[in-house]
Curated annotation (Swiss-Prot):
GO terms for cellular component: cytosol; oxoglutarate dehydrogenase complex. The keyword Oxidoreductase applies. GO terms for molecular function: oxoglutarate dehydrogenase (succinyl-transferring) activity; thiamine pyrophosphate binding. It comes from the Bacteria. The lineage of its organism: Bacteria, Bacillati, Bacillota, Bacilli, Bacillales. This is 2-oxoglutarate dehydrogenase E1 component.
Amino acid sequence: MTKQTMNYAEPWSQFYGPNLGYVMEMYEQYLEDPDSVDPELKQLFKEWGAPTTEAERFDHSESAAKTYQTFRLPENPTIFSKLVAAVKLADKIRHYGHLAADINPLNTQNKDTRRIELSEFDLTEDDLKQIPVAFICPHAPAHVKNGLDAINHLRKIYTDKIAFEFSQVHNLEERNWLISQIESGAYYPSLTNEEKVALLRRLTEVEGFEKFLHRTFVGQKRFSIEGLDSMVPLLDELIRHSIEEEVKAVNIGMAHRGRLNVLAHVLGKPYEMIFAEFQHAESKDFMPSEGSVAITYGWTGDVKYHLGAARRLRNKNEHTMRITLANNPSHLEVVNPVVLGFTRAAQEDRSNAGVPSQDTDSAFAIMIHGDAAFPGQGIVAETLNLSRLQGYQTGGSIHIIANNMIGFTTESYDSRSTKYASDIAKGFEIPIVHVNADDPEACLAAANLAFAYRKRFKKDFVIDLIGYRRFGHNEMDEPMATNPTMYSIIQQHPTVRQLYAQKLIEKGIITKEAVEEMEREVAERLKIAYEKVPKDESKLDFIMDPPKPVASKLPFVKTSVEKDVLRRLNKELLQFPSDFHVFNKLERILKRREGVFDGKGKIDWAHAEILAFATILRDGVPIRLTGQDSQRGTFAQRHLVLHDMKTGEEFVPLHHISDANASFVVYNSPLTEAAVLGYEYGYNVFAPETLVLWEAQFGDFANMAQVMFDQFISSGRAKWGQKSGLVMLLPHGYEGQGPEHSSGRLERFLQLAAENNWTVANLSTAAQYFHILRRQAGILQREEVRPLVLMTPKSLLRHPLAASDVEEFTNGQFHPVIEQKGLGENREKVERIILCTGKFAIDLAEQINKMEGLDWLHIVRVEELYPFPKEELQAIFARYPNVKEIIWAQEEPKNMGSWCYVEPKLREIAPDEVDVSYIGRRRRASPAEGDPVVHRKEQERIIQCALTKKEQ
């Protein structure tokens, strides 16, 4: 075989796509004039002959090999140019076929075929007939006999009811796998007649359900699926693959559009239960054994199209799989990272020390997006960015864009700057399939390809399901007023069930009478279910109080640890491998921790934290901590991950505790707040036994995730009964660093505090931090569990007055309030009680150490702000019979911090005729001064006012 005959040798394997086309053009030029090309190319052509096509390099089938052995590239420049053109045409069809595809069920978009016309490449059908199939479409089925057949085959595949975009996928193995699957038709379902009838039955159930709701509950919001009915069989197909592959958990996130239909038909929520929610009747009687979620009794509940559900399925091997539809607020797309967190938690085994073991095949996420929200909401890009990061990847998610080509009343030309709703995914190299929702079999094909790709490559996949919205945004909306052109077409357009039924009738697969009987059966089932729902609303009790265990205080949890245990753990945490080179300065800092259990110094904040973590792991509670720069700590205080200064190798001391009984991980998060916090919330919901902590770089940046605090963390239990023990660490304190590096917006968390929905604390000592972390770990699996919002310090991290003696760890516990030592000892003389919290308490303590004659003053630190320590403060006030004023002192402006929250509570419990007043910054629009000099003067003024006795 000469070099001119086809072979698989280098160097041509490094060329593909447009680059290969260029090299083939150069070869054509070389045949005419060898000296007209670059000397390097000339040498390659001389040595290796004609460039090999991608087809040759990646198809090793017997027929293709035979072609390569028998076909010799022509040296005639004209014939060779036709081959080059044919290869280019095939490539253009793969890249641009989607522009000409029949993917819009309303046919309202012009198809662009310019890039894939034969005339554009100076080709004729006769030219193509002379070219072997393998050069154009090596994966073509047997009926494709020549180049013309191959081009027609590619046109059919790439411009039909399903279209593909994968040129953004840079990995050659992935691209060629996609080409193989698509062009061979391997992914497309070959349904039996029985399966086609079953598919029609499913579409009949989907449509019948919506029509029944429309007739029965006139004008009530339901956000129907109509126009995207095929989404349900598409989900069915993904679920079928999952149970066959013995996946353990499938987690679904979606907004309101079509949610009730998915709840009924994918999650198995009984019709009766859904109808009861429309009827405002009791729905508890219809709770299935699988555990579908209804309105949560004892709380405020949520609207029916926000509720989630869970269902368990079994396959023939008795393998059980759990399907979960996440509870969801109306805030579009914000559930996405929550569902990813669910999935990572479901994939991991946290029962052993070290890093959790992860099995990405055991669970995956399906995210259903809106076509306006997918490009419009920034949380989408944030979440996509998590998909391949070590601390967040889940082995790929399947995204379905429920594309009805409109957002409320806004059409696509006003809602995005891209051609497709899915285009943002291209930046993450995610393959995209556009599919016409009026072709249910094509929708199943898209599901097959997505599942197979995710399984093989552990990466995300996007299905752009293009349909329409048969009615308005909700059932009280009239779309003809704002979108008359689109809706005049929709009103005349048959439903997907009607289209598919007609197709099966025409093929003789089913009779018209059988179709009508199918409709009657579905309608009868719905009617019977509706008749079971009670109609009398008068029996319902609308007084909804939280359950008693939650309404009460947190239970006592022993958080002190024996000194010998702490001493041993401390020693183990300071042991490194003999060949590990710790950074010199850091090594000196860590060495200081060695002597604290021998009376040499105190335990500072970061030291208390790592000891708390070590003891929690010893108790068998897994820990997951994430945040921006959290491994080291924003303020270089933590150092949970050490780096060898010669090799860069990492060492995590908490992985080497001798009696650790659970996993520990700490990840530096991407520069994202909302998606990461949502992810950690989701992780904690699915792994309730795990102490999950999220740390803001500065508390000021937590408001980038405000939607997560508002819609999930503070209210998730009241709306959905969804428990969480998530810990949020928000660095807070005024140190002259300006308005964006001073405030964790404490006031916002206190404003949201109600029904014991979380604990809000602002601590002043390392021991308090130790105990509150251990208390939180101790309540994780109790009914009283709740999130913990901690205003963490910056300047206190190394402050000697915030450090704690060993005895406070071995004999102490968490105290909601702490009285200032050395003050208030002469009870008769105390006239002023100052209440304060957090870092400002240390500012006052520092100044007090320089003063004398303070027997008229007492200072009380309120460490736990919510729940408010009413009884503890009342007991303190009662000890001082001559107190004249109770002052709340803070460094935050009057309209921020704790004052607005504590004022009415203090007035309620203050002794009669005792004035309650405020000292701090005046009301401000911005949290803090930008000038450090101005800050210092203002800070000094507040401290002086607080510590200066009033003149008589």
